[in-house]
Amino acid sequence: MLRRVAVAAVFATGRKLRCEAGRDVTAVGRIEARGLCEESAKPFPTLTMPGRNKAKSTCSCPDLQPNGQDLGESGRVARLGADESEEEGRSLSNVGDPEIIKSPSDPKQYRYIKLQNGLQALLISDLSNVEGKTGNATDEEEEEEEEEEEGEEEEEEEEDDDDDDDEDSGAEIQDDDEEGFDDEEEFDDDEHDDDDLDNEENELEELEERVEARKKTTEKQSAAALCVGVGSFADPDDLPGLAHFLEHMVFMGSLKYPDENGFDAFLKKHGGSDNASTDCERTVFQFDVQRKYFKEALDRWAQFFIHPLMIRDAIDREVEAVDSEYQLARPSDANRKEMLFGSLARPGHPMGKFFWGNAETLKHEPKKNNIDTHARLREFWMRYYSAHYMTLVVQSKETLDTLEKWVTEIFSQIPNNGLPKPNFSHLTDPFDTPAFNKLYRVVPIRKIHALTITWALPPQQQHYRVKPLHYISWLVGHEGKGSILSYLRKKCWALALFGGNGETGFEQNSTYSVFSISITLTDEGYEHFYEVAHTVFQYLKMLQKLGPEKRVFEEIQKIEDNEFHYQEQTDPVEYVENMCENMQLYPRQDFLTGDQLLFEYKPEVIAEALNQLVPQKANLVLLSGANEGRCDLKEKWFGTQYSIEDIENSWTELWKSNFDLNSDLHLPAENKYIATDFTLKAFDCPETEYPAKIVNTPQGCLWYKKDNKFKIPKAYIRFHLISPLIQKSAANVVLFDIFVNILTHNLAEPAYEADVAQLEYKLVAGEHGLIIRVKGFNHKLPLLFQLIIDYLTEFSSTPAVFTMITEQLKKTYFNILIKPETLAKDVRLLILEYSRWSMIDKYRALMDGLSLESLLNFVKDFKSQLFVEGLVQGNVTSTESMDFLRYVVDKLNFVPLEREMPVQFQVVELPSGHHLCKVRALNKGDANSEVTVYYQSGTRSLREYTLMELLVMHMEEPCFDFLRTKQTLGYHVYPTCRNTSGILGFSVTVGTQATKYNSETVDKKIEEFLSSFEEKIENLTEDAFNTQVTALIKLKECEDTHLGEEVDRNWNEVVTQQYLFDRLAHEIEALKSFSKSDLVSWFKAHRGPGSKMLSVHVVGYGKYELEEDGAPVCEDPNSREGMQLIYLPPSPLLAESTTPITDIRAFTATLSLFPYHKIVK
């Protein structure tokens, strides 16, 4: 599956493609300017994948703490045991490596070893508790666990799945009313965006990513990651995509564990997950699992690299998974731009290769040319999956000696072929060609105007201690006074800007490093794109003339020093993935710090990079729908339409000259938001286990909890400003979106200093109110919060800004609607949630025209009558917390709501039977279809919700195995536990292609799977059932890795007004009471006579969905620019067994409504 971090050409198996909503990937060296639809501005837009959460930290860190004691062994070969006495062994068994530098706030212990076969490993003992005290498991505890393991029957045929974060194959435990249509939640990297069109659905959807399966005082998951120092650059010319394909194939059984889906099944049975990804020069595999099963999981996983089967029978089926991944990627503008950029490399450079692979390159062409793909796979594995290219990281609550023993026993079996690692460093200057310094006009899939300016520099990895590109990007991406973006925003030419290098394989490898600046343009900005480029060049020239500034460098150091010193712990599986890649790039002492810290100020190194950023070496790419009709070229693999033009002569001549600087552009002033007080505050009220309501008035209430667990000088402030005004009409919902986006725009410049000082804020246009989220070092956090409330109180907009934002919002709505997965979600929720305004409703309201006057009247009315609900947690006293609510109430001076307002929709009760809503996808160039089969349950208890979670957990692995592995229906295949505004249900979703399957064939296959699953759970043994229950209990007991996870869980209760802060404890108690018969009975009841079943099909364009077979039966009459639902009739496959829905409003108007319901009992 494509691991997309910035522009990295990377892939992953799809076993854990959840795009990790809410995990903010900020690569080192990239400063991200916030604003409307900013995903389009990214140099190479980002898709967040597990473990790519690289901190933006940079510091000199004079007080970094070495880890452990000096053993007197540097780079030692792993030892199998020790002869110390029992007492000595216990004291020395967790001694860390003194050369590895770590943060003072990191309680973990580290040890580096190198096996006899050349594999390098980093062992991480996570025995420490959050106070930083280390405690070893007793011998009795370890023996007891071992006895339990030995006594447990491992019945592979009974193994079932957990509810991890998977989107393509994972059980997705998320609330439907918490599902968003915002770009950041989607599968392709075009839309990873924290601030564009945020709404409450996304706010809660982000929370659900982390809310499930977290509880304090219990142990974390164990995790491991292995990086092979070879990637797609090594693809043979006659088999494009082979490295990516091999990454898929090694999962398909091994000599020791031959079951094709055996590893996934084992993990799902024991609460784990796995993933893999392929980059240009690296391939990464990672998994996590309950600690009790970590050693066995390591042994099973290691067989990928010891003796994978890669049987011939599996090849054709897995090629289809790779091809589906490619088809899903084709409508992504980021992927298209990347392939186009790679094609500019000089002939013979690996950047010109097709890294993805598809059915054509891996199946049809090889057969035509008599190439044995199976034999070539094995050759590739033998040549490149060699131990001495590998770096391994394992993390668990075991002693370092225990981990060393396991790693040595298991991973020493990986073969070492003794051959030198592939080296591409001689292929420098791949873009030093006449074709590079040109203007490329590109026709995008989405509605967007964007300008990307790119330079290809010599490789910068060797300068990691200075990080010159990070220094430059910090200035280029600044949004304060004197910045590029501040100037362009004042001209109403740009909405967002991103500049830098993400340090991924595509942006930085052994042959070059990229520095890119991407700018989201307004309509007017598109007309002046040369002037926009000139502004960028003027700013860079100013930096070049000034030279590196030590003040700026030291400010970045101070900011990042604070963040590193007080860093919060991350999820183990993310952490080990990041570390195994770091081991490929940095010396031992910098494994933990190399990607985060600035160690040395060397102005000559910064100047060398900065002086190369000149117009004569720049590549310009202009994305716009306005380019259609003038682009006569087509890129081979993604079909991107583009043209190549010389840069206009007048601009070329100007940029060759000593052009004038712009007096409006200058360096940022000193930052007043940098924290200097890190004192941990004393309690001023009794300590509580859960948030307590400390203020309750007609105008609002406040929940508060002082942190006494993580003990870091940070705080989280969240407020929900609730108003009944928003949902009164589609126009109001749109006005609210405009309001929040203009408010964000207005705050961009004054709040940016706080943002770069690690004080983060986010404004969310919720379904029922404005959500304000602020977090960071508590010292200066009140300043930022007050700034936001001040700007909210004094809200204003110029006509130019109003026009700019509304035009961009039209593009944003359009871009959401043309994606099958988001349209499918919109259609499903439009059917289920009464009085919901669909995205098409909002698009039409916007196209009908709204005025600035109507916006200002709406905002005035919105602010006049509210109910404010807040949560404050962290290093803050109760008195200080009450001041936050008081500031909101005093500044806004609103009256209370007349009556209590529900923060959820009412849901329609589906009739019995099978209903089908089949609509056309809105992008005629997209073959992708989305099929969801949903079963409605109704108003259920917390016990039944938990039972449904258990059901979906059981369902996940066999669903993946049947629908993806065996039937090869698509890449994204997953069952989901649905909580739609308090009404329960479950669904199975498959993303497929109209070039391969009819959507109704897929629907029938889903039904076939569910029938077989019923038989499977009926035959489930009690032991297998109990093992799955235990796995889910362990997930729910999994401790929070940092304060933010605890806050997310509590905020989810506040923002949904459920307030069941000990929900996990209740769910665990419910799980302990379940029997196998409960599960079977519940499933049969929802699948038997009287079941309420809804199928939603969004149908792509391809030979299996021909127009003549699906002529529209009804078109929504209120069309705007073709944005309408086109309903299709069922084909003979489903015509007799389903009732078609050909008008959603007419269908739901006849249905009863469930009462408002909360799952709290």
From Swiss-Prot:
Catalytic activity field: Hydrolysis of polypeptides, preferably at -Xaa-|-Arg-Lys-, and less commonly at -Arg-|-Arg-Xaa-, in which Xaa is not Arg or Lys
Compartments (UniProt record): Mitochondrion; Cell projection, Dendrite
Signal peptide range: 1-18
Top-rank taxon: Eukaryota
Subunit field text: Interacts with BACE1 and NRG1.
UniProt protein name: Nardilysin
The keyword Nucleotidyltransferase appears for this protein: no
Taxonomic source organism: Rattus norvegicus
Binding locations of Zn(2+): 244, 248, 325
Any single GO BP term: proteolysis
GO MF term (any one): peptidase activity
Entry's Gene Ontology cellular component terms: dendrite; mitochondrial matrix
Residues at the active site: 247 (proton acceptor)
Cited function: Cleaves peptide substrates on the N-terminus of arginine residues in dibasic pairs. Is a critical activator of BACE1- and ADAM17-mediated pro-neuregulin ectodomain shedding, involved in the positive regulation of axonal maturation and myelination. Required for proper functioning of 2-oxoglutarate dehydrogenase (OGDH).
Cofactor(s), by name: Zn(2+)
Family the UniProt entry places it in: Belongs to the peptidase M16 family.
EC number: 3.4.24.61
Entry comment describing in which tissues the protein is expressed: Testis, and in a lower level in brain, heart and adrenal glands.
Alphabetically ordered keywords of this record: Cell projection, Hydrolase, Metal-binding, Metalloprotease, Mitochondrion, Phosphoprotein, Protease, Signal, Zinc
Composition skew (Acidic residues), residue ranges: 138-209
Pfam families according to UniProt: Peptidase_M16, Peptidase_M16_C, Peptidase_M16_M
Region annotation Disordered: where it falls in the sequence: 42-105, 130-218
Note on cofactor: Binds 1 zinc ion per subunit.
Enzyme type, top EC level: hydrolase
Predominant location category: mitochondrion
Entry-annotated residues carrying Phosphoserine: 85, 91, 93
